[in-house]
């Protein structure tokens, strides 16, 4: 049986990203292969045996397991699997491994994947395969059975305050838009002025889900966000995601797009949602539920992972230009 060395954060007690990816993919890998599991911060070096596969998420530390192992001779396949957005602060260090890897399974939304040719890392494109995220309904049950009255509908932001989340814009929306009332479930190093702070919430608990059901829309306004799992998780609950396209999803069923860094244009979107009839909101919700059942499924995600493992694709990429090398090296040094 083929041995797969899987490098990804995993924790069966945690259903949030990135653990949900490691859990869902890892459990399925274990059914089909002999699997060895590693955390992405582990500092071991793997010495492959003939036929072994390396699959997973690199870490920017040069003493981490993927970094130390990918250069070892003898791998049958080397497959990088990690989030992607056109933000060198997040992805520049992947370039250390790209030429050695057979494929890059890019976990991202359609917005970013459709624009790779315009990105600084466009030379990676031959190796990139689009991995649209998924959600497990067992952990994120449907709870939103009715919407609040017009003009009284509420928005929920779930997450932290890292730069890619663009929480300064979230604050401006709360302070300047008449049609939006935002609460924040989560923690972060920064404050988000104006929003109602709920703090950390354990969404595995009935009390937390009851609070979720009081909201109508999930909101996230990232500027450089691959495709946060909270979008699909909230949609599974029955909330309607209202998101910037730069949060990964562009013109997707069940998801409402909000303009990036344009308060006046965003207010137009929010005012329409506040004025919408129940029938209109229920139809958006229905389309989202249908998309989850049809497309945003872990079995579909894993099928693409397995195809990469069992396949033979290993397209070459061109060398970086001097300008590309300079930019990538500069941002790689940030870590």
Annotate each language-model stretch with its function:
Residues 239-244:
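Short hydrophobic beta-strand element within catalytic cores of glycosyltransferases
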Residues 137-138, 148-197, 203:
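Conserved catalytic-core segment of nucleotide-activated headgroup transferases in glycan assembly
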Residues 36-118:
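Extended catalytic core of nucleotide-activated donor transferases of GT-like folds
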Residues 102-142:
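Donor nucleotide-sugar binding/catalytic pocket of nucleotide-sugar-dependent glycosyltransferases
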């Amino acid at each position: 049986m083929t041995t797969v060395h899987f490098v990804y954060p995993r924790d069966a007690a945690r259903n949030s990203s990135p653990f949900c990816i490691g859990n869902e993919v890892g459990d399925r890998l274990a059914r089909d292969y002999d699997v060895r599991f590693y955390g992405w911060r582990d500092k071991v070096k793997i010495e492959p045996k003939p036929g072994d596969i390396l699959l997973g998420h690199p870490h920017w530390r040069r003493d981490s397991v993927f970094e130390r192992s990918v250069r070892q001779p003898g791998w049958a396949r080397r497959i990088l699997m990690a989030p992607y957005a056109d933000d060198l602060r997040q992805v520049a260090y992947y370039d250390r491994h790209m030429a050695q890897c057979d494929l890059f399974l890019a976990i991202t939304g359609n917005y970013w994947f459709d624009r790779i040719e315009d990105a600084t890392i466009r030379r990676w494109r031959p190796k990139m395969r689009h991995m649209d995220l998924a959600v497990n309904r067992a952990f994120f049950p449907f709870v939103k059975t009715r919407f609040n009255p017009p003009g009284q509908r509420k928005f929920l932001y779930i997450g932290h305050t890292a730069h890619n989340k663009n929480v300064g814009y979230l604050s401006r929306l709360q302070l300047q838009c008449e049609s939006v009332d935002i609460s924040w479930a989560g923690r972060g190093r920064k404050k988000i002025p104006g929003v109602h702070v709920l703090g950390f919430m354990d969404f595995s608990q009935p009390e937390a889900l009851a609070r979720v059901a009081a909201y109508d829309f999930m909101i996230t306004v990232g500027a450089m966000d691959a495709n946060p799992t909270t979008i699909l998780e909230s949609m599974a609950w029955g909330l309607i995601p209202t998101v910037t396209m730069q949060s990964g999803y562009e013109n997707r069923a069940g998801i409402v797009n909000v303009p990036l860094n344009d308060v006046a244009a965003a207010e137009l979107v929010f005012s329409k949602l506040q004025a919408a009839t129940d029938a209109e909101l229920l139809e958006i919700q229905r389309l989202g539920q249908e998309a989850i059942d049809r497309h945003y499924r872990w079995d579909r995600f894993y099928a693409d992972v397995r195809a990469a493992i069992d396949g033979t694709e290993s397209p070459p990429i061109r060398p970086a230009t001097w300008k590309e090398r300079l930019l990538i090296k500069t941002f790689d040094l940030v870590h």
